């Protein structure tokens, strides 16, 4: 395909225009008075959301240079979402502010590499200041406040805090397993069930059943546990046929699934003949065997292993485990409500406790405690209901974000919310870090950009951004604007806080992309095809698949 190339100012301005288009659509959602954005879908009802990364994913621009600019900012939102689970809109607003100020200085003759170094040094100092200011989360009320802000509903925040305590063994734990399900009832209900999550995802992306969320959801599946590798489909075929006749999906957990066995499962999944997901077993060596046995006890199945005289060819349905639901992403697998007996699970838990007491190795004890938490902790299920499907999807998305937000708060602590932590951390840059020239310019760009989230929150609340930023900069540490009612308060005392992990990630990712923008000297893009040239001749007549 032919390419088009833009250089210098033309290249950077094209990228900036794409960034601004995306950022302007996203930033209206920031803060308690933020608005919603309606996203049209190819089929079904439109989605209404105030989640930055969801909005960013939907934006596709026509101009090739603008499209690249928008894609770069999408990366900021996606990376922040992946790392922290929230803060995507803040990251986008920061990126826009950094790029706008940076390009203005580059156009005026500043050296982009000097500015880049200044930005990096300033961000490192601000990050350090944020981590120093962070307070550890110690109470259920603090988690409820953090999650409640993310979900824009204090009642949901309280349910999430309750869920974290319920499956964390009576204490806050960032590894608490909390899933969100759609329900036919109104409101949000909490249910704690037997279950487990381990950090292995699907072997092939083709197993995903929900392409938008890139996850595979199996309802009431059989679970096949195998200690070795599966590569020969002939070994697996007799069991597959029995599972197919039962009409249930199948989750396979083994050392690996490869070759013709994997390709057969994928082809049948794509054709809709048989729904299955293959996942690598967690751990290595003896730990893998032990964890497979944990899953077997939890699901009421048996591990197929030659050590106990069981083989795939002779395996039957009674050897398979079962669960109410299994959710598999690219990174982890969650088993909800396994069919194992209470007595066997309790016996396994006691056995692990004895092993912990008898172990001399700190590392072994740590791994055994992880297994104990997974087996004994269970899974908290938040069931979400709403009047319409559109509202239900939006609510579910908000709650999932709030859960990840709460976990981030437990992990690294919390700082004052509402954009105030960033603005007040900017004081560390007051003397330009004693740098000079273009590096000092980079520091000043960061200092100015750190006011952008607070200004946007104020603007969305109908207040004058400059006046609010000036007022907050003069307030004592931790005090700032409560945009919900327009009052200036002690934000931590009022329960208005953000996980420092979210704030830190938003700044670091925004600065990373801004540095790329400023140091770009050429952009190579695909040349747009003339209208009507994109379709292949005869594709319609052949059904678009060559007649197969």
UniProtKB/Swiss-Prot annotation:
A GO cellular component term found in this entry reads: cytoplasm
One Pfam family here: Cpn60_TCP1
Enzyme's top EC category: isomerase
Q: What is its EC number?
A: 5.6.1.7
Task: Name the major location.
Answer: cytoplasm
Q: Which residues bind ATP?
A: 29-32, 86-90, 418, 482-484, 498
- What does it catalyze? ATP + H2O + a folded polypeptide = ADP + phosphate + an unfolded polypeptide
- Can the keyword DNA repair be found in this entry's annotation? no
Do the record's keywords include Cytoplasm?
yes
Q: A GO term (biological process) for this protein?
A: protein refolding
Where is this protein found?
A: Cytoplasm
Keyword terms of this UniProt record: ATP-binding, Chaperone, Cytoplasm, Isomerase, Nucleotide-binding
Q: Which InterPro entries match?
A: Chaperonin_Cpn60_CS, Cpn60/GroEL, Cpn60/GroEL/TCP-1, GroEL-like_apical_dom_sf, GROEL-like_equatorial_sf, TCP-1-like_intermed_sf
For this chain, one GO molecular function annotation is: isomerase activity
Subunit annotation: Forms a cylinder of 14 subunits composed of two heptameric rings stacked back-to-back. Interacts with the co-chaperonin GroES.
Q: What is the purpose of this protein?
A: Together with its co-chaperonin GroES, plays an essential role in assisting protein folding. The GroEL-GroES system forms a nano-cage that allows encapsulation of the non-native substrate proteins and provides a physical environment optimized to promote and accelerate protein folding.
Q: What PANTHER family does this protein's entry cite? A: 60 KDA HEAT SHOCK PROTEIN, MITOCHONDRIAL (PTHR45633)
The similarity comment for this entry is: Belongs to the chaperonin (HSP60) family.
Query: What is this protein called in UniProt?
Result: Chaperonin GroEL 2
């Amino acid at each position: 395909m032919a390419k088009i190339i833009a250089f210098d100012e033309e290249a950077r301005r094209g990228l900036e225009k794409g960034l601004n288009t995306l950022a302007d659509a996203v930033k209206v959602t920031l803060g308690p008075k933020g608005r919603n954005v309606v996203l049209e879908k190819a089929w079904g009802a439109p989605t209404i959301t105030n989640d930055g990364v969801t909005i960013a994913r939907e934006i596709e621009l026509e101009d090739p240079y603008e499209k690249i600019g928008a894609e770069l900012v999408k990366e900021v939102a996606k990376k922040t979402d992946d790392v922290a689970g929230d803060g995507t809109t803040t990251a986008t607003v920061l990126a826009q502010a950094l790029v706008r100020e940076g390009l203005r200085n580059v156009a005026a003759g500043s050296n982009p590499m000097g500015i880049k170094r200044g930005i990096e040094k300033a961000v490192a100092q601000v990050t350090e200041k944020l981590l120093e200011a962070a307070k550890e989360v110690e109470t259920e009320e603090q988690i409820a406040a953090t999650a409640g802000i993310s979900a824009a509903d204090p009642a949901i925040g309280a349910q999430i805090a309750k869920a974290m305590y319920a499956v964390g063994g009576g204490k806050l734990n960032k590894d608490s397993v909390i899933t969100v399900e759609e329900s036919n009832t109104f409101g949000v209900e909490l249910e704690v069930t037997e279950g487990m999550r381990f950090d292995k995802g699907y072997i092939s992306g083709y197993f995903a059943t929900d392409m938008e969320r890139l996850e595979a959801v199996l309802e009431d599946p059989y679970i096949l546990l195998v200690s070795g590798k599966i590569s020969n489909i002939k070994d697996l075929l007799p069991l597959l046929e029995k599972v197919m006749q039962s009409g249930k999906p199948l989750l396979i957990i083994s050392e690996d699934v490869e070759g013709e066995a994997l390709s057969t499962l994928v082809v049948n999944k794509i054709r809709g003949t048989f729904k299955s997901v293959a996942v690598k077993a967690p751990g290595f060596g003896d730990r893998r065997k032990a964890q497979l046995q944990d899953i077997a006890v939890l699901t009421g199945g048996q591990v197929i292993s030659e050590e106990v005289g069981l083989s795939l060819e002779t395996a039957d349905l009674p050897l398979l485990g079962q669960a109410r639901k299994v959710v598999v992403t690219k990174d982890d697998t969650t088993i909800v409500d396994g069919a194992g007996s209470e007595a066997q699970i309790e016996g396994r838990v006691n056995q692990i406790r004895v092993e912990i007491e008898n172990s001399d190795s700190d590392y072994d004890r740590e791994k055994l405690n992880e297994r104990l938490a997974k087996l004994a902790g269970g899974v908290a299920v938040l069931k979400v209901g709403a009047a319409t499907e559109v509202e239900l999807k939006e609510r579910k998305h908000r709650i999932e974000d709030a859960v990840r937000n709460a976990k981030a708060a437990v992990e690294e602590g919390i700082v004052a919310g509402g954009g105030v932590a960033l603005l007040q951390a900017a004081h560390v840059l007051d003397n330009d870090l004693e740098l000079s020239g273009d590096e000092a310019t980079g520091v000043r760009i960061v200092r100015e950009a750190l006011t952008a989230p607070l200004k946007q929150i104020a603007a969305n609340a109908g207040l004058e951004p400059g006046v609010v930023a000036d007022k907050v900069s003069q307030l004592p540490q931790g005090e700032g604007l409560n945009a919900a009612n327009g009052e200036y308060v002690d934000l931590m005392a009022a329960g208005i806080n953000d996980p420092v992990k979210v704030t830190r990630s938003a700044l670091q990712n925004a600065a990373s992309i801004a540095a790329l923008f400023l140091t770009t000297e050429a952009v190579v893009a695909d040349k747009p095809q003339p209208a009507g040239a994109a379709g292949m001749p005869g594709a319609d007549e052949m059904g678009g698949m060559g007649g197969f």
